[in-house]
Every structure is written in C-alpha cells, then in structure tokens.
Amino acid sequence: MSQNQTTIAPQPGIMEISLYEGGASKVAGVENVVKLSSNENPFGPSDKAREAMIRAAHGLHRYPNTDHAGLRGAIGEVHGLDPDRIICGVGSDEIIHFLCQAYAGPGTEVLFTEHGFLMYRISAHAAGAIPVQVAERDRVTDIDALIAGATPRTRLIFVANPNNPTGTMVGLPELERLARAVPQAILVVDAAYAEYVGDYDGGAELATRLPNVFMTRTFSKIYGLGGLRVGWGYGPREIVDVLNRIRGPFNLSNVALEGAEAAMRDREHIARCQAENARMRAWLAEALAEKGVPSDTSCANFILARFADAETAGACDEYLKTQGLIVRRVAGYGLPHCLRITIGDEASCRRVAHVIGQYMAERAESR
C-alpha cells in the first residue's frame, strides 16, 4: 500500500468477530456420509411445505409481501398469539441481530452464558457493544450468575432455553425472576428448540405479560427448513415496532413465506417428528452411557456426549469421520471434551452408537 493510501477502519467491534463455521457435511475420501453436526430434522420438511414452495416458485418474478401477514397469521393461529406482536426474519439469527442493532451499541453490554449460542457474541460485537459472558452451573444456565453479572449498562440478556449445545434448560419461573431483577434490559428467550419440549411455550406467555421479555423461534429445527432461513420473534408491540423499522422490506422471499406457513400449519408432521426425536434421543443417550460416554438430560434434538478429556473427544471425532459419521466438536463453546450429536433417524442413531462403542473399546484395549 502506498503512503497516499489509507485504510478505512470498520466500526468498533467488527474485527473482534471470529468467522462462524457451520457443521461440516463432507469427509474427503468417504462416501455415504451421515451428517449429525447441525441439529437438522432428519425427516426434512413436511410434504405440504414442499408443495407450497413449488407453487410459490411460479411467482418468483413478483416481489414478496412486506408485512408477512400470512405467515404471522399462521404463527398466531397455531400458538395463540397476536400476529401484530410477531416479526419474521431470515432465521432467528436475523432477529437476534436486529435486537442488538436496535438496543445495544458502544458503551452498552450484552449478557449471555458461557456455553450460549455463538451468535450472541457475534451480534453484540457487530453492534459495537461489549459482550459479557457469565458462568453456568454444571452446563445449566445460572440465573443468579446472570443477575449478578448485570450492570446499569446491560441492555440485552440472551438465554437459549433449551440451550445449544448443552441441551439443558431452566424453568419459566426462573426466567421471570431474571426479567424482573434486571428491568433495564430486554431478556431474550431464544427458544429455537422449544418444539422438542413438552408443555413449554418457549417464553411466549412471559413475552405477552412482561414489557422486557422477547422470544425468538426458528423454522430451521423441527420444521426441517434450515436451508430456507426463516425465523420469528414475539414480544411487546413497542419492541416489534422498533425491529420492523430496521428490517429490510423484502427480507423473506415468496418461497420462504409460503413454505414456512404451510410447515407451521402441518401439525401432524410436527407431532411425528417430536415423537420420533423423543424416542431416539432417549435410546441414544442410554446406548452411549452403556459404552462409558455420559450426557446431560437433553431437551432438544441432540445430545452432548462427554468424554474424559479433549484429546479423547477429538480422537473419537476423527474416528467417526473415517466411518462416515460427522458430529460437532464444541471447543468453541468452552466444551473441548464434548461432542454434540444430532438425533438422526433410527439407522443413524444406531450407527453412531455402534461406532462410538467400537472406538471406546479399541481405546480401552490400547491402554
């Protein structure tokens, strides 16, 4: 660079962001790979959603609706929520980004737990805010630690419930206690995995009743639409109004809107996926425990397998790859001794349990 050229610096915080790495889907030299690294629904979207997207493709030359009225109406109908208090985005990631853009900034703080979703830190930095991480208690959100970690500068508190990658969760009374203890901040309940929990509204009732609670949800998990990128948020009208002012008018395509609406309305497909996930989640956790690999009780569509140390976990991951199985290392979440394993279909679960059993047996014999 010549002396006459200058480097134009980005906004504060941008260069603190580490590039996000999604779950791998290929292994060099290995065929018939089973991907269990991204918490995807192994059964994919419902047939009704597929059909709706095909129909919508005939209108790709038309701009989509800007108000997302059809999708918001379907969400409101299914969940018993006011559609006017719902905002839709490009995955729940975009909603998280909107919240940080609108309510955080230089000199403010964004609070989250040590094993929380990486997008909280990324979005805080993108807004120029200070990300603040607090400890968990045995891989479970510690409400007291969050309350103690809050300051007058705290503007947002993110709690994934259930949490990714631990799969653990806290009760709604605890979340309400947190919201009331830190009234100057918005408590964001990230309920991406809420559909995998029985008798749980993801924090919707709290977001209806309290002025500083906001809930985010996604179509990427149980709805099987990770490739479509659709999420939504629900909370006080005042917050939704603010977020809509920075939302791009055409952020969701016609295909995304129609596919997500049809997926939301197909409750039979969701019920089948819920039942199968619960069945195989329990089976896989027990099967791995019998092979000396424990895990916490998971409330999501994955389990967090714990090994003796980081070296053992890493070696197991490499062994799984040689057998065509891709799981997720979670050292970036502060859990280097763990592997996160998506609950796949029955064949995939049995296969990964068998291969991990082989690995553990071979490792024991080599000592």
Curated annotation (Swiss-Prot):
- Decide whether keyword Transferase is in the record: yes
Essential cofactor(s): pyridoxal 5'-phosphate
Question: Care to name a GO molecular-function term for this sequence?
Answer: pyridoxal phosphate binding
The UniProt keyword set, sorted, is: Amino-acid biosynthesis, Aminotransferase, Histidine biosynthesis, Pyridoxal phosphate, Transferase
Enzyme Commission no: 2.6.1.9
- What top-level class of enzyme does the UniProt entry assign? transferase
The entry sums up its family as follows: Belongs to the class-II pyridoxal-phosphate-dependent aminotransferase family. Histidinol-phosphate aminotransferase subfamily.
The family database entries (PANTHER family) matched by this protein are listed as: HISTIDINOL-PHOSPHATE AMINOTRANSFERASE, HISTIDINOL-PHOSPHATE AMINOTRANSFERASE 2
What's this protein's name? Histidinol-phosphate aminotransferase
Q: Which organism is it from?
A: Paracoccus denitrificans (strain Pd 1222)
